Amino acid sequence: MDKNCFEKITLAKGEVNLYDFGGMKLHAYRTNDFLADEVFVVEKDGQAVVIESPCFFDNDRELEGYIAGTGLAVAGLLLAYHMAGGGFLPGVKRYATRQADEYGHRGGGKALIDSFTDAFGAAFDNAVHQVTDYVEPGEVTIGGIRFNIIPTHEAFDVEIPEIEAVYTHMLGHDCHSIVAGAAHAGAMIGRLKGFLAKGYRLVLTSHYTPEDLKDVETKIAYLEALTEIASGCAGADSFKAAVKERYGNYGGENYLDMTARFFFG
C-alpha cells in the first residue's frame, strides 16, 4: 500500500485519509489541532477499533460524527500514548496495558496532559480515559480485528498484521520528535530498525500522516545525528542551534525544545 493512495475526506476542522485494503479499511483522521494529532479507525466487517483519542472537544465531536456517518459499530478504543480526551465516545470500551494506564494517569503522559491544560484551557479535553479492559503484550482480537501489542518504555505500539501496518507514538520524517536523552534515542533506533526488518507497508503515528519504510530510514539517520550533535554540545541552546542548522526545514520546534531539556536539563 502506497502511503499516498487514499481518498481524502474533508471535514469542518479535520480531514480523513481513507485507505482501502479490500477486506479492511483504515480511516486516518488528521485533527488539525494545536498538537497535529492523528487518530486511526481500523474497519473490518462493519466493526471498528479506534487507535488513540482526540484530545480537543471539537475534534471529539467531529470524529464521533464522522464514525456515526459510516454506520460502523465501535468495538473499542486502544489507548497507548494519548490518554486525554476522556469525553470521546462515552460508553465504548477502553483497552490499554497496565503500563500505558500508569503512564497516562500518573506518569509522563499525565504531566503532558497537565501542561496542555495550562496551554490550551477550556478547548482541551483533559479528562483522562478510564481503562475498562487491560490487555497483555502479544496478540489480541477486538471487534474481529487482530492486533499485536508491543510494549515500549512508556506504553505500547500496535501491530495490525492484516494490513501490514504498525502504530507507534512518533516518527515524522521531516519534523522533530520528543527524544528523552541518548538512551531513549538508542531505543527508538532499535525499534525503528525492527520496523525495517518486519517490512511494514505503513507506519502510523500520533503526530503525522501515515508513512513508509523510507521515512523510517530517514528518521533513524536523524536520531543518530541528534545523538552525535548532543555529544559535542555544552548546553541546550548550542544543541538547538546546531540541530536547526542541520535540519532547518524541519517542523515541530516545540518538540526540539523538549528534547533539549531532556538532554541538558
Predicted regions and their residues:
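Stable alpha-helical elements in mature extracytoplasmic
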Residues: 59, 63, 85, 112, ...
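Active-site-proximal beta-strand/loop segments in catalytic clefts of secreted hydrolases
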Residues: 31-32, 45, 52-54, 78-83, ...
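Active-site metal-binding motif and surrounding structural segment of the metallo-beta-lactamase
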Residues: 46-48, 56-100, 199
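Conserved beta-strand hairpin/beta-sheet module of binuclear metal-dependent hydrolase folds
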Residues: 10-66, 156-170
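Accessory terminal helices/loops
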Residues: 2, 103, 197-199, 209-265
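Metallo-beta-lactamase
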Residues: 3-16, 55, 105-226
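Active-site environment of divalent metal-dependent phosphoester hydrolases
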Residues: 35-36, 57-59, 79-88, 101-104, ...
